[in-house]
Amino acid sequence: YLNEFHGAKRRFSEEKIGDVVLVDDYAHHPNEVATVLKTARQKYPDKELVPVLIPYTISRTKAFYKDFANVLKEADKVYVTDIEPAREKFSDFPGVSSDLIIKEIPGAEHISSEEISKLYKHKNAVIPFMGCKDPTWLIDAYKEGLNK
């Protein structure tokens, strides 16, 4: 039966498009993000590592933004989306945004589905999309933009 097991969904789920590997992973804690980046580096040592973090909950971002930044600094280029607030309200966390993470990482940038074309300049890359929120909205935007 093991040969029929395809692994857990949203744990380093890969899709190859040309010379780019898109990875979908549920990583939403700095330790999990570190594991995804390490796996990507080991599996694709010759590819540029370009993670996209989708921070989940405002409180987690506030608590761990420096830890996220320290882990993500190991990548070649980093993109961070807006925080997915889930059940939380931004008004309860003044001053907390994904910019906390971005400002800690030299060269890091904000990204959204409208800004997905920023990823097209990364050739021969592995792009892990990481977070609790299903990143299909970003991955689909990436693919749709390629077809234009």
Task: Identify what each model region corresponds to.
Residues 1-148:
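ATP-dependent carboxylate-amine ligase
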